[in-house]
Swiss-Prot record:
Name of the protein: Insect-toxin Cn10
Any GO BP: defense response
Disulphide bridges, residue numbers: 25-78, 29-54, 38-59, 42-61
Family to which the UniProt record says this protein belongs: Belongs to the long (4 C-C) scorpion toxin superfamily. Sodium channel inhibitor family. Beta subfamily.
Localization of this protein: Secreted
Stored Pfam families: Toxin_3
Location of the LCN-type CS-alpha/beta domain: 14-79
Amino acid sequence: ITACLVLIGTVCAKEGYLVNKSTGCKYNCLILGENKNCDMECKAKNQGGSYGYCYKLACWCEGLPESTPTYPIPGKTCRTK
């Protein structure tokens, strides 16, 4: 049973670019690959991810719950001030 739960958790985990819900923009990063800031942001309590790194100058997260939005947010374009 435990193995099945682990497998289901892995299959159902979401991944994608972390997005700022207010602006609709990706979280930017400069240090590609392993990135402490991206990892910290992805693992934050309000995000719920298991791992994060910098990919194509934006934070990519793995192991996100389905409830965490990823870029792009449908119907919302990236707007900065």
